Curated annotation (Swiss-Prot):
Pfam families, A to Z: TRAP_beta
Name used for this protein in its record: Translocon-associated protein subunit beta
UniProt topology in membrane: Single-pass type I membrane protein
Keywords of this entry: Endoplasmic reticulum, Glycoprotein, Membrane, Signal, Transmembrane, Transmembrane helix
Cleavable signal peptide: 1-17
Cellular location(s): Endoplasmic reticulum membrane
Length: 183
């Protein structure tokens, strides 16, 4: 009898815990390289895996100080009235890094109501972690096509190829006299 009561209480607790909204949130950088002065794209994905709609959902990311990053498009603080169960929402922000160096990309905060008259639930997104922001000059040095460098290389190799070619050609012209034709 006690075992039956414990099982019923456990099932009741599990069913109560599964009611309401549950949000899973991720934050990801879409750029392969973060470069000073170039656009850096962030994407926030929020999934409602709960059984009811999440209400008054607010995403807030305070990890990008205005002295280090400029906002090109989008907002770092966003609010949705509701996110339906078994659905997702994506939000994209484009930033422009103003300084080069290492930066810790921390998680954003998400707050919502799991049920209409329930308490406010506070959560965090995933954190991309520490990443390097390359200086524009360093990025160009590593990844530009280097046309000027290749042109300079070609000009510098011309004497080592051209002088032996000219010597051979003058020698060939001197010693290869055409045979006179007999009439």
């Amino acid at each position: 009898m006690r075992l039956l009561a414990v099982v019923v209480l456990a099932l009741l607790a599990v069913s109560q815990a599964e009611e309401g909204a549950r949000l899973l949130a991720s934050k990801s950088l879409l750029n392969r390289y973060a470069v000073e002065g170039r656009d850096l794209t962030l994407q926030y994905n929020i999934y409602n895996v709960g059984s009811s709609a999440a209400l008054d959902v607010e995403l807030s990311d305070d990890s990008f100080p205005p002295e280090d990053f400029g906002i090109v498009s989008g907002m770092l603080n966003v609010k949705w009235d509701r996110i339906a169960p078994a659905s997702n929402v994506s939000h994209t922000v484009v930033l422009r890094p103003l300084k080069a160096g290492y930066f810790n990309f921390t998680s954003a905060t998400i707050t919502y109501l799991a049920q209409e008259d329930g308490p406010v639930v506070i959560g965090s997104t995933s954190a991309p972690g520490q990443g390097g922001i390359l200086a524009q000059r360093e990025f160009d040095r590593r990844f530009s096509p280097h046309f000027l460098d290749w042109a300079a290389f070609g000009v510098m190799t011309l004497p080592s190829i051209g002088i032996p070619l000219l010597l051979w050609y003058s020698s060939k012209r001197k010693y290869d006299t055409p045979k006179p034709k007999k009439n």
